[in-house]
Amino acid sequence: MQNKIDHKNIKKIGLVTRPNVSLDKEILKLQSILSIYKVELVLFKESSEILDLPKYGLDDLFKISDFVISLGGDGTLISLCRKACEYDKAVLGIHAGHLGFLTDFKVDEAENFFQAFFQGEFRIEKPYLLSVFLEDKQGKILEKLAFNDVVISKNNQAPMAHIEVFRKEKKFNEYFGDGLIVATPAGSTAYNLSANGPIVYTLAQAFILTPVCSHSLTQRSIVLPKGFEIEIMAKDCILCIDGQENYKMNDFKSIKVGLSDKNVALIHPKNRDYFQILKEKLHWGN
């Protein structure tokens, strides 16, 4: 993953917006700002039906762009980050949605950001993703990435989930309840937090297992290091990646999860303070 961006030689910036919402006004404002720096704004083909701007499929957009803007909420950014890993491209999150824990600022603040950006005043953070290996009954392995979390939950027919977790073929825990969350540090402030899981610093090389509504008072979250791969077995359960992709666990004979070697470069304002964000979003202190 790239460690830096050559801000002096940016030619094209891609833009992907929150789906099913018209953000043409915001797009035009960003285009106007970027034109000052002689940078072309190019769109994902589904981001606008009206605007007469160059439009591309998602793969082509990543290929031609120096980096890509996510204009929406956290969900838009999360799905884009998984794609960015394929092309080794950075992502900038601009808020225009419901949830904004990961996005740093709104379009109204973009002029100040880009003024600083093109002077080299920005920072890049590279949180790690989860690798998920799904092996079907024929032995074919599908690898997926998760930015926030992988959630195993009971289906509608099961009274509760029975989930077994192994490491190197040795069982180290068994969960009875509504499900199990496997979260990245970046995802520790999402579903994991609402299930009383711990907050883990975004750039930590670790991941979290958090039971959901466990039927045992002794079951608690556990933080595991990079290099620790787990195998999860559960019947009549659904595996969900980042709240966006669902798989029936009965369709697979093996599911393994661990912290990936892949990370994604997120562009932030230089003065971004992770702990200040926690304080504001979670209403810590005064």
From Swiss-Prot:
Positions that bind NAD(+): 74-75, 148-149, 178, 186, 189-194, 244
Cofactor needs: a divalent metal cation
GO CC annotation: cytoplasm
Coiled coil location: none
Entry EC number(s): 2.7.1.23
Function, as annotated: Involved in the regulation of the intracellular balance of NAD and NADP, and is a key enzyme in the biosynthesis of NADP. Catalyzes specifically the phosphorylation on 2'-hydroxyl of the adenosine moiety of NAD to yield NADP.
Family: Belongs to the NAD kinase family.
Full protein name: NAD kinase
